[in-house]
Each structure stands twice: as structure tokens, then as C-alpha cells.
Amino acid sequence: MAACAPVLAPHGVDDAVPTLTQATFQTRDGETLPLRIWGPTHPKAVIVALHGMSDYSNAFTPVGEWLTDHGIATLAYDQRGFGQSEHPGLWAGGDVLRHDLSDAVAAARRKYPGAPVFALGESMGGAVVLSALARSDAPNVDGVILVAPAVWSRSDMPLSYRTALWLASHTFPGMHVSGNGLKIWPSDNIPMLRALSRDPLFQHSTRADAVYGLVNLMDEARHAPDALPATTPPILFLYGKNDQVIPREPTEAVVKGLGDRAEVHRYEHGYHMLLRDLEAKLVWQDLADWINRRVADVVAHGRRPHPSSSSG
């Protein structure tokens, strides 16, 4: 049965200094991840953005270009196992993904000295960011943006789902599964979804053991609010009321757990892919407004800003 255990992507020795170029992010173990950067040379704020499952850094092209006109830089890398990274399709493990986030944030601070740095996570990326906040080596950020974070844990799933997942990942870990036939709409932006269906870098099926790894990560994110330290930076939580990917119940449980740490926006016409929905510009504007308030507070007081009260 050992040969049928879930497979993790290879990991090198942690002896490199994480660095950013215009097109790459070199990790602490020497892996080179594709990087995209949008923004002015001297931004007023910097966002390190993490994409969702099956996706890659191109997900942030529309919002990254829009934020550029508002003086905000966005840095997005292909997380391990996705896009043009090495070992596509193989799950890297939650700890490795969290280390990459912390290292990317530190490298961004070196690249843009003095600029406030924010971590943004969409779906799976949101699970990476949220779970990282509960760790002793949490990323050193001035604020966090969670966009429809993946928080559907085992405790929220039917027993049949949990059983099928374990059997598939431990019996046929390399078996590929897809969402075809589920009639789930991740967005109301049909042209965007059609473009993704033709994009060779978007993963149209997923290994069973990678799904198992994702659920492990969602478990950690789901329960992270209970372990957040008092030093947790302010959080902007964005969620669409028409999200068909992550159920509302665990999402609202996480919102409740975050309490006054988070400013919450629920979008009446929003789906899972909020940053690419038809009404995405409403979300972009809320995001920019929140960052502007956080930046103003940091500049005025020389400290991390205090969370605003929830709305929506």
C-alpha cells in the first residue's frame, strides 16, 4: 500500500535566499517559479497574490492591470504544481506553499523598501494565506485579502465524500478527476470561462492525491481563526452570495471566527471567481479603497492598521 500513498512533489534543500526578478521567484530550496508583476516602479502598496486550485498567476492579469492605474503593484507567481512550474499536477504540501508565501513577501519587501505589503489569496490561495496566519512563522504583511477562500473542511463534508476521497487518494493517487458534469458555475463571466477551457496552462483535471492535499489545506484554513495571534494583521474578506464552489456554511463559520479582525463584503451577484466576474470592478474598487485606508493608517501612525468593522 505504500506505493499507493499520496505523492508529494520533490523538495530541495533550504539553503537559497529567496529572490524576485521581473519574471521569476526563486524559493528557499532553489526552485524557480514563474512570476508576473503589474504596477508602477514606486508603488504606494504591494500585493503578493496567490491563485486558486488548477489556476496560475495569469488569474490576476485583469485586476493587476487595473490596480496599476491606482498606484498598487501586484506580484503573482505560479504556485508549485500549477501553471508553468516544475512538476505540474503534483501537490507540494501545505507547509511548502506557506513557506513560499512568507518568502515571497520577504522578497517583495526587499524589492519595494518602505511600501506596505499585503497578501491576497483566492480560493486555494486563500486557504494558504489564512492557514499561514496561524503559524509562528506567519508572513510579515500589513494586511490580508481573502477572496472566496477554500475553507470546506472534512468536518463540513458528508461521510460519503470523505470516504471516497481517502480511497481514491490512497488506492489510485494518480487518477485524474474533473468537475465535468457537476453543473457548478464558478463565475457568471462566460467568455472568461470559455477562455480558461482553452488555456493549456489551466489544469482541467486533478490528481486524486492533489485533491486530498487540498482538503488537508482546507482543514487547516477552516480552523485557523481559532489559532490566530493578537498580532494578526487586518483582513478584508470577500465572498459572493452565488458561490457554488465553497459552501456558505463553512464560509460564514470562518467569518464568525475572524470576528472584528475582518472587514467583510458579501456580493449579491458575486460568484466564486469574484475578481473575474462580470461585476469584478466593484470588487476591485472595494479592494483598492481598503488598501488605501490601510496605507493611510500605516503612514499616519507608523504601525499596522486596526481592522474596520464588518459590512455587507
Q: What is each of the regions a protein language model found here?
A:
Residues 1-27, 31-40:
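An N-terminal hydrophobic leader/cap segment in hydrolases
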Residues 44-52:
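Short beta-strand element of the alpha/beta-hydrolase
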Residues 54-57, 83-112:
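Catalytic nucleophile-loop/oxyanion-hole region of alpha/beta-hydrolase
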Residues 64-88:
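Conserved alpha/beta-hydrolase
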Residues 124-207:
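Alpha/beta-hydrolase-fold enzymes
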Residues 231, 237-239, 243:
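Short beta-strand/loop motif that positions the catalytic acidic residue
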Residues 233, 247-256:
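Short alpha-helix in the alpha/beta-hydrolase fold that links the catalytic acid
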Residues 261-311:
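Catalytic active-site module of serine/aspartate enzymes centered on a nucleophile-bearing elbow/loop
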